[in-house]
Amino acid sequence: MMKQYMETKFQYQDCILFYRLGDFYEMFFDDALTASRELEITLTGKNCGQEERAPMCGVPYHAVESYLNKLVSKGYKVAICEQVEDPKTAKGIVKREVVRIVTPGTNLDTQALDESKNNYIMCIVYIADRYGVSVADITTGDYFVTEIENSAKLMDEIYRFSPSEIICNEAFYMSGMDLDGMKDRLGITIYSLDAWYFDDAVCRQKLLDHFKVSSFAGLGLADYDCGVISAGALLQYLLETQKNDLSNLTHITPYASGKYMMLDSSTRRNLELCETLREKQKRGSLLWVLDKTKTAMGARTLRKYVEQPLIDKKEIEKRLDAVQELKDQAISREELREYLSPVYDLERLIMKITYGSANPRDLTAFRTSLEMLPPIRYILQDMQSELLKSITEDLDPLEDLCSLIASAIHEEPPIAMKEGNIIRDGYNEEVDKLRRAKSDGKDWLAKLENDEREKTGIKNLRIKYNKVFGYYLEVTNSYKDLVPEYYTRKQTLANAERYITPELKELEDMILGAEDKLYALEYELYTEVRETVAAEVERIQQTAKAVAALDVFASLALVAERNNYVRPKINEKGVIDIKDGRHPVVERMIPNDMFIANDTYLDDKKHRISIITGPNMAGKSTYMRQTALIALMAQVGSFVPAKSANIGISDRIFTRVGASDDLASGQSTFMVEMTEVANILRNATSKSLLILDEIGRGTSTFDGLSIAWAVVEYISDSRLLGAKTLFATHYHELTELEGKIENVNNYCIAVKEKGDDIVFLRKIVKGGADKSYGIQVAKLAGVPDLVINRAKEIVEELSEEDITTRVSEIATKDKVSKKKPKVKKYDEVDIAQMSLFDTVKDDDVLEELKNLDVGNMTPIDALNTIYRLQNKLKNRW
């Protein structure tokens, strides 16, 4: 047995081998050490002919999935080695084979997977400075392929699909991409595969064979090179791990990565699209607000929509038309939602059916779902919007399959497939006969006994049974002259003879073998039904996608109606004009409609950048996020929380909101912030929407102000970037840029002062804030009065008047200089800001500054010295 184990393990060295022994899956050697540690199970030992006992541990077969999922969730590959012959009939060692390999991206356990999101596996091939990318979810049949020209866009695709597993060629693995960051921050397991997986000819042939086509033109892949290699390598990997023909992968969809709005991981987190930033929960996210879907398929599709907003105006309008019609047709919509409610996850059910793992209850769940389709289609037939008409056409009621399952499968079958009671009475004559034999055998024997007495005239004829002869007819010697010729003698006794007849033999076979035959026949018929359903996988998948899309549009329509959303107008002119916009999540979290609505106006001309000032806690971040979310919702195809909204299409949304130290990579808060800013400035376009909060706060005031100022100038210049931007800052000096840079406008959060206290009005108004109210916010936060009072004294001594004046002077100077035809390079813009902090040529002040013993000064001594030197300079200037 151990020899067999070692031979199997040699073939799957990168896997933990679950080796079936009776009622347990056993692990040995290093696998046992790893499994016992990760699963927290007892480690024992086994004699295997070596000097030391082999480490061993095991898990019961009936609970294997929970242990399996725990290992897979930690990034391990697990090979399942099953007994493939009956131990009772085996000669020698029972034959065993690996029947599947489970990895994070190939887990088929629907109980362990989140039904509201896809479980993607991605294959990346790096060849000649291009990336071939393919993505599949084998639980739903999704299969996509594209080609990408640079690493930034590749990261966008990784963020968009959020795969649980990436397989790649060695060139990508060694390309310098931050693979550790993907593993740690995104939770992705990454494997580099052997070179033969990526052989061009092998990959191409795999795809042609699987999809049964003769050329790639029929697949839409004629112009794809490294994309085809990626898709072929992924298919080969899936075939090897699943050990089946992957018949639910019926289509491969090529796509252009530029079809959707790009959202990097920072933006997805900061906008809390699908989960909250802190708790990592759905409640409190945008998806939580929008998701009123009734089916798992609909929930997954809505999540895709939220994570992949459209950038094509026609496609957006089609979605909005569908939502509009279902919003207007409220009665029909609620009827549809009522019929959608009992529909199970058709995509993952058909996966189980095609892979042969569906149990009888899965088929009854499938039938229950199909029974809902005719009334859904009936209601849809009067809809007029293009997408709803398309859904109606694609929604095949599958009445033939529904009828087959209803007639063949018991109403309430067991989960087990080989314990009978699966096939419905009346479906198969042989099943009915065996079932009667199992339950009515004694009655049949009594009837046969009575019939034989009447036919032969043998009054004392008896049917008896023993283990040697089975059932037999016993006739006493006094009546043996009446025994007919078709009786066959089996045994002679002193006073009687024992006989069998063909009919009795048939009854015996039926009675004694009825249960075994019944269970075997029921299983055979069940698999026939299952295979008949599996053969229609393409019809079922098409219907599943239609049902999912309908569920999404009905959900968005319901949310729009309940939450008083409006249909956004979509424009391609770069204008974002929102009246009385509201944050979709925050307004649902606070009571009694207390949310304060605000307007937003941005365009590509004179309103490109809004500089927003105001105290902490006043609502700046909420306002900026709300604008981004409204723009995103519109491009998803959803109605939006506003009185009116005219949304210009954005190709990307970037957010730079908050930061913390990245201890794992040794980066400070400021370094994290600057890295994010650099990413935005490199990858944003003039069609992007930027949400920037407190740029430059992680360093000294002067450095921070310089950087923030330079960033505003860079973004505002259409020759450099020219993106629409909401820019929140505590550097009130930046408000001087309004009027100096023609497309910069000031806004602030209105505040009402009551003595030393303040009230946040949450209203965005024109103009800049004259102070930050930091001391008042500190008071609201509960800072001790002693500290508050001292802070008031210090703030009166510190004046920023000179800084503000110098900002105005430099901005004016820059405005004049920019009239020259030469375009400044970005590093020149940086250098220009340094004039704000030019050294004052007062030798005595410089000398005193040089001689200060900074290391031994208290904070208050430092402040007093700064104040004294500042006054000295004021008097001279």
Regions found by a protein language model. Name each.
Residues 355, 359, 369-372, 425-426, ...:
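Charged, surface-exposed helical/loop "interaction arms" that form contiguous linear patches used
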Residues 81, 104-113, 245, 381-387, ...:
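Active-site phosphate-binding and catalytic loops of NTP-dependent enzymes
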